């Protein structure tokens, strides 16, 4: 009976769209998934190809703190579908998981491809329509949906498409899309491959690993910073404390009087970085380092300045921007402007840090929308 009462279209066959389809199909509804590309293709590169499904944070308010945009909106969402529910979902789908020490949750297969195949197996009854949706027009008792090839009519629409794929015909406010979770271009290009552990960003009050690349900086800390500072105009400066642990540089100098400064600093940092940090004093013996030089090096360590000139958009995995959260009901994911129209996952102006948080948003909002459609 349900499938005859409702005709449901999901626009976007990414993580949120496919999981929404899973719950709707499970409840007996017929679902049409629109996407010009292969379903779940964006899942394949996640977690470095290993698919970081979620993060082991089980308090919904603490979990929501990992989203620079969307924290309060997600309180209601995560209270309905938490990390516990995500683990139960993937167990149901036949995906076994494990948790790393840093809290990141992965499939035991360490394969995004394996996760994709299992999800698609469970939504095989959906109608996959390989067309791009260009316009949605509200009609009596539903919506006309226009693609690049044809026109369709559905009683319920779920928008689950992200990036710059704007759909015409609706009066929703869409926040412009900007790169998030990307590497940052700097004028430091000689340290490619160097990794510094537990670096503290003084500007953003965050601690994580920092990777130097051929274009500048990357890795977890750079991604978090890029997500927070999406609206900052280039160029801007960042300041880092490279080593927050207590240490006595003068004591190290006294204990190693005949060692070069670069070799002494190599006991704290990777050798190439120690040499870079030492600068013109790299080969000066410790016993010749005076107080002024010592303080100069200490200031570099605890106030390391980097000039940010842009983002490395070729590395882009997540965008900030999307449908304005003020126009979406977080308890149902239904539009406040149009009945029976839902907006989820990648389409929302929500972005999370690295570590499985963006996929958690996809699973949770996909479930909440499906639950609302089922109960409506």
What kind of region is each of these model predictions?
Residues 162-163, 349-376:
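A conserved FAD-binding loop/helix module that cradles the flavin
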Residues 25-48:
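Glycine-rich FAD pyrophosphate-binding loop
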Residues 41-127, 132:
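Conserved N-terminal/central alpha/beta ligand/cofactor-binding core
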Residues 6-33, 369-374:
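N-terminal Rossmann-like FAD-binding beta1-loop-alpha1 element of flavoenzymes
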Residues 27, 59-61, 79, 85-103, ...:
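Residue-level recognition of phosphate/Mg2+-coordinating polar/acidic sites
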Residues 113-114, 121-270:
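Predominantly flavin-linked oxidoreductase catalytic cores and closely associated redox partners
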Residues 8, 29-32, 97, 157, ...:
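Hydrophobic anchor at the start of a short beta-strand
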Residues 11, 45, 155-160, 343:
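Redox-cofactor binding/interface segments in oxidoreductases and associated redox assembly factors
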């Amino acid at each position: 009976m349900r499938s005859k009462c409702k005709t449901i279209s999901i626009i976007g066959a990414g993580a949120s769209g496919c999981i929404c389809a899973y719950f709707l199909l499970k409840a007996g509804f017929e679902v049409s998934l629109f996407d010009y590309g292969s379903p779940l293709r964006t899942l394949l590169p996640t977690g470095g190809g290993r698919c970081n499904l979620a993060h082991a944070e089980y308090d919904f308010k603490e979990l929501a703190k990992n989203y620079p945009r969307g924290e309060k909106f997600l309180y209601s969402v995560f209270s309905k579908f938490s990390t516990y529910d995500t683990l139960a979902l993937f167990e149901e789908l036949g995906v076994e998981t494990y948790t790393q020490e840093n809290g990141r949750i992965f499939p035991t297969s360490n394969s995004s491809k394996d996760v994709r195949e299992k999800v698609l197996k469970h939504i095989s009854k959906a109608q996959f329509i390989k067309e791009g949706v260009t316009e949605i027009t509200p009609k009596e008792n539903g919506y006309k949906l226009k693609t690049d090839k044809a026109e369709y009519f559905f009683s319920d629409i779920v928008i689950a498409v992200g990036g710059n794929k704007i759909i015409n015909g609706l009066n929703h406010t869409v926040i412009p899309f900007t790169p998030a979770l990307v590497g940052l271009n700097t004028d430091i290009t000689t340290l490619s491959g160097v990794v510094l552990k537990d670096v503290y960003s003084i500007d953003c009050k965050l601690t994580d690993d920092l990777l130097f690349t051929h274009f500048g900086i990357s890795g977890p800390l750079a991604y978090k910073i890029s997500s927070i500072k999406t609206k900052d105009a280039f160029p801007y400066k960042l300041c880092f404390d490279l080593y927050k642990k207590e240490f006595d540089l003068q004591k190290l100098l006294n204990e190693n009087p005949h060692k070069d400064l670069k070799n002494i600093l190599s006991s704290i940092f990777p050798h190439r970085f120690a040499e870079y940090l030492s600068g013109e004093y790299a080969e000066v013996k410790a016993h010749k380092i005076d107080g002024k030089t010592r303080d100069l090096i200490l200031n570099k360590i605890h106030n390391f300045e980097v000039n940010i000139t842009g983002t490395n958009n070729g590395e882009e995995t997540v965008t900030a921007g999307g449908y304005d959260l003020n126009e979406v009901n977080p308890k149902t994911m239904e539009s406040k402007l149009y009945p029976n129209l839902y907006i989820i996952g990648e389409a929302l102006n929500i972005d999370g840090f690295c570590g499985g948080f963006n996929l958690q948003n996809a699973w949770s909002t996909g479930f909440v929308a499906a639950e609302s459609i089922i109960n409506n």
